[in-house]
Curated annotation (Swiss-Prot):
The gene is VEGFD. Residues 1-21 form the signal peptide. The keyword Iron does not apply. SMART domains: PDGF (SM00141). It comes from Homo sapiens (Human). GO terms for biological process: dopaminergic neuron differentiation; fibroblast proliferation; induction of positive chemotaxis; positive regulation of cell division; positive regulation of cell population proliferation; positive regulation of mast cell chemotaxis; response to bacterium; response to hypoxia. It is found in: Secreted. CDD domains: PDGF (cd00135). Undergoes a complex proteolytic maturation which generates a variety of processed secreted forms with increased activity toward VEGFR-3 and VEGFR-2. VEGF-D first form an antiparallel homodimer linked by disulfide bonds before secretion. The fully processed VEGF-D is composed mostly of two VEGF homology domains (VHDs) bound by non-covalent interactions. This is Vascular endothelial growth factor D.
Length: 354
């Protein structure tokens, strides 16, 4: 009996040591993961604009979101449905109009000088037997929200503006006197801490992270023939992903927004040809092919059409403002001339019949 009790105690001690060793082994990993989450939270809390927030949460493709905000017609470049809009993001989709509203609201609520009215008597600290008419004046004072809980909107520069008011004293012994009053006007504002603090002193709120969403980052863009695996937190081949074929992941791949011969220029917010043409050749605007321009002002004029130098084509509509030429015909303002041989043929005839 005593021997069995000793064996049980030994196994219990070994089990306790094993559990402690396992917790010590994973402790640094958990602390490191928690530290990463805290840093990410700090960055998100300190974001001062929608663009900065998207830059943090979607660091690889924030420029495209900026383009979508700037260009309202960007979403119409793709013929797919709204749920599969042209985007290189593999994260959550946002409606572009909603983002515009959020961005405008964010800008309006930033810490900045705002027009407000202040009571003159309280502002100047006058006695109760003196009052002003009008009693209040319009000035600019700092107001708005800061992006961190520990900061407040404070003025960094002040000017004094003069207001002409009636000063009245009681009991009334004379008529109201017109006096100049100087009132503080805030010209600069900034979010400043109220007191020195620890950089990580923000109150933490309890957030439960679902087991299936514990990747250190959100879904990422995967190469063609690969899909994002939320369990492995990485891109895997389609045959390795158990959900392959059961869910439409076409929106996670590089979209065919600009076609096979073009690419999206994030700085210019437009589709451009991947390979430019030599200077002596014209580039087709749709398929980016290079060709020699065979049309000219003269050839188009013979067809009774107008020459478009950018597309090297003869079209009915003028790309510039039209004006009447000396011949009485209407032509482009920059192309008000006709073929030389035609003018030569018209010359003698015009001299005979002025």
């Amino acid at each position: 009996m005593y021997r069995e009790w000793v064996v049980v105690n030994v196994f219990m001690m070994l089990y306790v040591q094993l559990v402690q060793g396992s917790s010590n082994e994973h402790g640094p990993v958990k602390r490191s993961s928690q530290s990463t989450l805290e840093r990410s939270e700090q960055q998100i809390r300190a974001a001062s604009s929608l663009e900065e927030l998207l830059r943090i949460t979607h660091s690889e493709d924030w420029k495209l979101w900026r383009c979508r905000l700037r260009l309202k017609s960007f979403t119409s470049m793709d013929s797919r449905s709204a749920s599969h809009r042209s985007t290189r993001f593999a994260a959550t989709f946002y409606d572009i109009e909603t983002l515009k509203v959020i961005d405008e609201e964010w800008q309006r609520t930033q810490c900045s000088p705002r027009e407000t009215c202040v009571e003159v008597a309280s502002e100047l600290g006058k006695s109760t037997n003196t009052f002003f008419k009008p009693p209040c004046v319009n000035v600019f004072r700092c107001g708005g929200c800061c992006n961190e809980e520990s900061l407040i909107c404070m003025n960094t520069s002040t000017s004094y503006i003069s207001k002409q008011l009636f000063e009245i004293s009681v009991p009334l012994t004379s008529v109201p006197e017109l006096v100049p009053v100087k009132v503080a006007n805030h010209t600069g504002c900034k979010c400043l801490p109220t007191a020195p603090r620890h950089p990580y002193s923000i109150i933490r709120r309890s957030i439960q992270i679902p087991e299936e969403d514990r990747c250190s980052h959100s879904k990422k863009l995967c190469p063609i023939d690969m899909l994002w695996d939320s369990n492995k937190c990485k891109c895997v081949l389609q045959e390795e992903n158990p959900l392959a074929g059961t869910e439409d992941h076409s929106h996670l791949q590089e979209p065919a927004l600009c076609g096979p011969h073009m690419m999206f220029d994030e700085d210019r917010c437009e589709c451009v040809c991947k390979t430019p043409c030599p200077k002596d050749l014209i580039q087709h605007p749709k398929n980016c092919s290079c060709f020699e321009c065979k049309e000219s002002l003269e050839t188009c004029c013979q067809k009774h059409k107008l020459f478009h130098p950018d597309t090297c084509s003869c079209e009915d509509r003028c790309p510039f403002h039209t004006r009447p030429c000396a011949s009485g015909k209407t032509a482009c303002a920059k192309h008000c001339r006709f073929p030389k041989e035609k003018r030569a043929a018209q010359g003698p005839h015009s001299r005979k019949n002025p």
